[in-house]
Amino acid sequence: MFGKLLTKVFGSRNDRTLKGLQKVVNKINALEADYEKLTDEQLKAKTAEFRERLAAGASLDSIMAEAFATVREASKRVFEMRHFDVQLLGGMVLDSNRIAEMRTGEGKTLTATLPAYLNALTGKGVHVITVNDYLARRDAENNRPLFEFLGLTVGINVAGLSQQAKKDAYNADITYGTNNEFGFDYLRDNMAFSPQERVQRPLHYALIDEVDSILIDEARTPLIISGAAEDSSELYIKINTLIPNLIRQDKEDSEEYVGEGDYSIDEKAKQVHFTERGQEKVENLLIERGMLAEGDSLYSAANISLLHHVNAALRAHTLFERDVDYIVQDGEVIIVDEHTGRTMPGRRWSEGLHQAVEAKEGVRIQNENQTLASITFQNYFRQYEKLAGMTGTADTEAFEFQHIYGLDTVVVPTNRPMVRKDMADLVYLTANEKYQAIIKDIKDCRERGQPVLVGTVSIEQSELLARLMVKEKIPHQVLNAKFHEKEAEIVAQAGRTGAVTIATNMAGRGTDIVLGGNWNMEIEALENPTAEQKAKIKADWQERHDAVVAAGGLHILGTERHESRRIDNQLRGRAGRQGDAGSSRFYLSMEDSLMRIFASDRVSGMMKKLGMEEGEAIEHPWVSRAIENAQRKVEARNFDIRKQLLEFDDVANDQRQVVYAQRNELMDAESIEDTIKNIQDDVISAVIDQYIPPQSVEELWDVPGLEQRLQQEFMLKLPIQEWLDKEDDLHEETLRERIITSWSDAYKAKEEMVGAPVLRQFEKAVMLQTLDGLWKEHLAAMDHLRQGIHLRGYAQKNPKQEYKRESFELFQQLLSTLKHDVISVLSKVQVQAQSDVEEMEARRREEDAKIQRDYQHAAAEALVGGDDGSDEMMAHTPMIRDGDKVGRNDPCPCGSGRKYKQCHGKLS
């Protein structure tokens, strides 16, 4: 109450922010008359003038008003479009590391030109990031004339470009592209073998369109570059035949499980678990098929791989539904994005789930993949010096943007008042009653000439509605993942008189629905249209537009509430753009997923008290509030999952940053001779310590073992026992020095034989290849650790703390093994000439060419520890050498010259 009173008196935080920015808008408006008088050449010269001022020490804020005024004037001349004041406000929000919520149709694409131009003046590059290639190309080509008029270059970064084309795109002042491609390029750059192979510049300013889709919906999806692992397709096929023999355990309204079953499904958590009976049944079936030894347990350490396959098959059959979660097209399983309804060709679920779904559908099973590099969008985008985003729906997720990314959300007012009428939800008892009511509403709208957009949550639902409309002889268009190519055309004409369009989630469609249809697309369809043809098309459109407005504008009809209020708001936001008339309503039933899982008890109780009859709907603010509360619960749960994922990934991210920084230093260095010298002493000393323990008596020394190890691993054939027998004054320290000196002498002899330049190049190649191989193994070990870490909770241990501790131990092993393996390889390999190094490089490039790039969907539970009954024995551990660890005061293995505790040891 008191808070509301304060807001009334002082205004909300959002109002105060906008009030402060309005002063700059007034400055820009004051400059408009002067800028209109400038010639084209004088206006273009402003870019060079701004760059000179920045070079002389001026800040971006000090030139913002003039820069925005320049872009506004250039836009008037190039596009005949003038930025509204609200677009100037949006541009300022985007320049200040914030998120601008701008409603659909308010011109986000034109708004983005303001901060993009301003930040491009620094010469460090601006990345404008969209959700798909079509939008990236469209926005780049649409805005190119404006930026080129002002003397800036524009690049497009999409999949399939050559290395040089990518370099050119990144070297442009402003680069348009998709979030996936920017993330993949970052990973590929950190797998490069020479500075020339890198394409990205340091990450400066990212401006993300549909920011909620990329930073929130995609936050649980890591980008993964992977190579094919061993083929186990036969095992997937065999295990797939087991699952139909299993029975689901029933549950009653009380949520208590009753009856005997083999597995239970937790719909809220999207998890499936074997019951004790199910576990026994699966083990017996496996024994019958000769896949498990008699008396053996599926949960024993030796059968972890088998358990992994069984769990994947069970999840594929019980949690993933055809035409909802995926479609089968041309013999391939293609994922459907639950948030946008789009198909995602090339993406695959990880953890063997995709292969299990392929076995279930009887299509060709592709190999499992081994992770070579990965990063989450959360950690990729947090690396940018400046980050901003825009969307039509951000306010519901404002807390998450602030908490995870440190980005405040500012709601930018619309240019014209919003007059859309949002009606209360109608709730029916059954889905059949709901669909009948929807058909009736559509018929009513068509009678008065009002266009209708029907939003569905799945392809299956859109096809069911389409069949009902065919039966009722209602002409309609279907827009779902299966009809991707026609998308822009269908959306463009969805606002025509009486048009009916069925669409799976409209998020990120990128094309506005114009009342009366899109007349620009009609003109573009003609070859060299005359002025008369253009005028006629415009006049016809105006007539249709007026008729649609008179009929009530676009009517949005939702067939089910989504888990997220934001995606419901995106659907609603398709109507009422730029002050147009419009309306929206959601039709629900007690059989809908959200209602059944989260809101059923309370709403069912209301319906029973009211004595609902068949075909009757309940419409009450209490019901809408109960549904909204259910959505809040789901949103809070999803936020917790994303937050937990980030906490786990932050551990890996610290290590990733260290390894990638190390690689870049290695690549950029002329020579790593000093690094090799620093680590050789550590490695040889560590091996000596294992056979001659420090400060120990001679009786405890294993001299024959040391001689053998030095010869096997470092090609050092030394008569250590002979030295000790002949020289009484030879003690532990002097012996250590002599062995290390012997290695140095042998290495110097190798250098004299092949030449210093060849050996220096070989050292770099060996260090990089060894680091990459160990990093790949380390990622696999981290994956296994993460999958089983949740079980530590049963032992009263904090899984996060355990994960941090064990992952750091794994990282220490990585650094230790890196030192050892590099010195061992350099000792053993005989380099004859430059051609040997070139041959090694050629082999490495051949291997690189075999790597397939996969964008994998890792289910959240796979990332933060699944519930598959696996345990710590699952963790793959690299080769461990006793006593071969890095001491806190030892030189850091990265070769920086600093002590380990002051360098990479800080990770602890």
Curated annotation (Swiss-Prot):
Cofactor list: Zn(2+)
Reaction(s) this enzyme catalyzes, per UniProt: ATP + H2O + cellular proteinSide 1 = ADP + phosphate + cellular proteinSide 2
- One Pfam family named in its UniProt record: SecA_PP_bind
- Keywords, alphabetical: ATP-binding, Cell inner membrane, Cell membrane, Cytoplasm, Membrane, Metal-binding, Nucleotide-binding, Protein transport, Translocase, Translocation, Transport, Zinc
List of residues binding ATP: 87, 105-109, 512
Give the multimer and partner information.
Monomer and homodimer. Part of the essential Sec protein translocation apparatus which comprises SecA, SecYEG and auxiliary proteins SecDF-YajC and YidC.
Q: Identify the domain of life.
A: Bacteria
Q: What does this protein do?
A: Part of the Sec protein translocase complex. Interacts with the SecYEG preprotein conducting channel. Has a central role in coupling the hydrolysis of ATP to the transfer of proteins into and across the cell membrane, serving both as a receptor for the preprotein-SecB complex and as an ATP-driven molecular motor driving the stepwise translocation of polypeptide chains across the membrane.
Any one Gene Ontology biological process term?
Answer: intracellular protein transmembrane transport
Top-level taxonomy: Bacteria, Pseudomonadati, Pseudomonadota, Gammaproteobacteria, Alteromonadales
Concerning its family, UniProt says:
Belongs to the SecA family.
Localization recorded for this chain is: Cell inner membrane; Cytoplasm
Q: Supply the name of the protein.
A: Protein translocase subunit SecA
Picking any one GO molecular function of the record gives: protein-exporting ATPase activity
Sequence ranges of Basic and acidic residues compositional bias: 879-888
